[in-house]
From Swiss-Prot:
Keywords: Cell cycle, Cell division, Centromere, Chromosome, Chromosome partition, Cytoplasm, Cytoskeleton, Kinetochore, Microtubule, Mitosis, Nucleus
Described function: Component of the DASH complex that connects microtubules with kinetochores and couples microtubule depolymerisation to chromosome movement; it is involved in retrieving kinetochores to the spindle poles before their re-orientation on the spindle in early mitosis and allows microtubule depolymerization to pull chromosomes apart and resist detachment during anaphase.
UniProt-listed InterPro entries: DASH_Dad3 (IPR013965)
Stated name of the protein: DASH complex subunit DAD3
Superkingdom assignment: Eukaryota
Main localization category: nucleus
């Protein structure tokens, strides 16, 4: 890892008794800690949002998911039906 790529706020800035791998692991843990703090803030904001707003968003997501599932089922049915026509009963229909 490039020493200049380390965050300036690092509490353990290149201690001489640490190997480069140990320092890199500590830097990764520090980044993970920062990401967890950001996640906690986002979850707190989400939890403080009105329940009706969250429910409306989930309902919209459910409708979209249902539509995609219906389209997928129709596509699979169409493919299976076409294969049955091509392989079995479709000899006389010009395909």
């Amino acid at each position: 890892m490039d020493p200049q790529a380390r965050p300036q706020s690092s509490l353990l800035t290149a201690a001489p008794e640490l190997s480069p791998l140990e320092q890199e692991v500590l830097d990764e843990y520090e980044r993970l800690s920062e990401n967890m703090k950001k996640l906690a803030v986002l979850l707190d904001e989400l939890a403080s949002a009105p329940a009706t707003e969250i429910l409306d968003g989930l309902r919209e997501l459910e409708r979209k998911t249902s539509l995609v599932f219906t389209l997928l089922k129709a596509s699979v049915y169409s493919i299976v039906l076409q294969q049955e026509i091509d392989w079995g009963g479709g000899a006389g229909d010009g395909h």
